[in-house]
C-alpha cells in the first residue's frame, strides 16, 4: 500500500518540523525504494513538490489525527536533539579551549622551569665560588698564623736565652761591682783620686762620674746613656746608691697606652714589677679587669707592645677570686685581696701557686671603708722604694687611713701607722718613698693630690698638686718605683703619669 505525503512534503514557509518530516519521508523513500516525486502548481499558481512512499508495514494510511501526533512527536524529538546538539557544541568548545590552554601551558612551562633551573644553578655556582674563595682565604690565614706562631716561638726561645745570658752577666757584674767596692780594683792612670780600700760608701766611688758609668756599662753590656739618665724629678740618678727619693712636687698629663674592649674593663688594675725576677723583665705587664663577682683572670704580656696591642702571652686563673683594684706585682708575685675577706694573698706567678695568706687584723672589707668611688676598695696594696705596703682602715681608727708595712715573703705586718685622713673622703692613694699621697676626686678633670702623710715623721700636710682625670673615672692609681711613674685605670683606659720629686 502506498502512503501519500503531498501535504507534509510540500515546500513552503512551514515549520522546521515539516522539513524534518520531509527528511523522514526521504529516508522512508530510500528504505522502500518505491518513492514517487511529483511537481505541480497549486490553485494560486505556486509550485509544489509532492512525493509518495509505500509504507513497508501499514496496509492503509492512518487518520489525520494520527499523522499530527507523529509530527508533534517528531518536533519534540527535534527540539531535544537540538538542545543536546547545543550542549554538545558547548562541551566541545570548552574542551577545545581547555585543550588549547593545556597546549600553551605545556609549551610555556618547560621554558619557565628551565629558566628557574638556570637561575638556581647560577646561584649555586656563585655560592660555590664564594665558598672556595673563603676556603682559600682561611687556608692562607691559617698558614700565616702557623708561620707567625713559629716565628714567635723562635723569638721567644731567643729572648729566653738572651734573658738567661743577661741574668748570668748581671750576676757576674754584681760580683765584679762588689769586688770593686772591696777595693780589689787596681788604680788606673785616669783615676782622679785615690780610693780608700774596703770602703762601702757609694759617694767614695763618685758613681755619678761618667768614667764609672762607662765601666759599669762595659761590665753589664748596657749603654751608659741608659744607666746615667735624668730622673723625672730633674736630677741625676744611677742604679746604685741613689734611690731617687724625694717629695712629690708635680704630676704630668696622662698618657693612654691601652683601652679595654668591653664593659668588664670599666675599672681594673694593671702593673709592672718594679723588682722583676726571672723569667720576667721590666717590660712584662699584667692586667686584670675587675668588673664582676668572680674575678680570676690575670692577663700577662711579655712585651709592652703586646700589651698595647692587646695580645696576652699567658692568662693566669687565680685559685680564688680577688676583690677590687688594689692588687700589685712585686718580686715575681701577685699580691691581692681575696674576695669578701680581709685576707691578703701572695700568688707566685712563675709557679702559679699560692705562697702565703694573711688576714689584716681588724681591716674593713667589702664596702666597710672604701675610697670615695666605692668598688669595695677597702684594702689597697702598694709598692714603693721601701717595699710592700697595705692601705686600709679599721673600726678602731674610725674610718681613718691605716698604713702597714708588709713582709713580702710571709705577709707579716712589720710596722703600722694611723693617719688623720678619712679614707672615704679621698678617691685613691699611693705611696712614694715612704710617704702616703691621696687624690681628691676620681671624676673631676681638675683633681688634686691633696694630702701627704710621711711615715718617717708621722706628720701629714695638705697639698694642691694638679692631677688630671682625663676620662673622669679613675678607679686605680699606683706608683712604680722602678719607672718613677704613676699607673692608673681611668674609665676603661690604662694610663701613666710622669712625676717630679724634689731631691732630698
UniProtKB/Swiss-Prot annotation:
It comes from the Eukaryota. GO terms for molecular function: fibronectin binding; frizzled binding; metal ion binding; myosin light chain binding; receptor tyrosine kinase binding. Residues 106-131, 170-200 are annotated as: Disordered. Changing residue 227 to G: Reduced processing. The record marks 226-227 as: Cleavage. Homodimer (via N-terminus). Can also form higher oligomers. Interacts with OLFM3, FN1, NRCAM, GLDN and NFASC. Interacts (via N-terminus) with MYL2. Interacts with SFRP1, FRZB, FZD7, FZD10, FZD1 and WIF1; regulates Wnt signaling. Interacts with SNTA1; regulates muscle hypertrophy. Interacts with ERBB2 and ERBB3; activates ERBB2-ERBB3 signaling pathway. Interacts with SNCG; affects its secretion and its aggregation. Changing residue 272 to G: In GLC1A; uncertain significance. Changing residue 229 to A: Completely blocks endoproteolytic processing. Completely processed after 6 days of expression, and releases a C-terminal fragment with similar electrophoretic mobility to that obtained by processing wild-type myocilin. Residues 1-32 form the signal peptide. Changing residue 361 to S: In GLC1A; uncertain significance. It is found in: Secreted; Golgi apparatus; Cytoplasmic vesicle; Secreted, Extracellular space. This is Myocilin. Ca(2+) binds at residues 380, 428-429, 477-478. Changing residue 345 to M: In GLC1A; uncertain significance. A motif (Microbody targeting signal) lies at residues 502-504.
